[in-house]
Amino acid sequence: MNDSEFHQLADQLMLYIEETLDGFTGDSDIDYETNGGVMTLTFENGSKIVINRQEPLHQVWLATKAGGYHFNYRDGHWYCSRSGEEFLAKLSEAASAQAGENVSFG
């Protein structure tokens, strides 16, 4: 994958997350802000999730209250470099824990 392909895939992922949050109908208020390729989700309890791209490594990084994770793209999905867990599943798990209700990204 070249840098251009990486940016296109990372942009698609960020847009999908934004669209999912815009359509969220739960009780929790989840705000998001994207600045310089870094997306920050802020929850009512003040906790945050940070998603950012690491261009030199062609990875997307996810930072949650539970820990930090690095994801590589293969076979149409982003997978954790340690656990093999898919990005949207991990994001759903973390967002649900931090929101105190089910938040699904896929």
UniProtKB/Swiss-Prot annotation:
Record-level GO BP terms: iron-sulfur cluster assembly
Annotated SMART domains: Frataxin_Cyay (SM01219)
Top-level taxon: Bacteria
Keyword entries, A-Z: Iron, Metal-binding
Keyword 4Fe-4S on entry: no
GO CC annotation terms, alphabetical: cytosol
InterPro entries according to UniProt: CyaY, Frataxin/CyaY, Frataxin/CyaY_sf, Frataxin_CS
Pfam families: Frataxin_Cyay
GO molecular-function terms, A-Z: ferric iron binding; ferrous iron binding
Family: Belongs to the frataxin family.
Known role: Involved in iron-sulfur (Fe-S) cluster assembly. May act as a regulator of Fe-S biogenesis.
Stated name of the protein: Iron-sulfur cluster assembly protein CyaY
Organism this protein belongs to: Yersinia pseudotuberculosis serotype O:3 (strain YPIII)
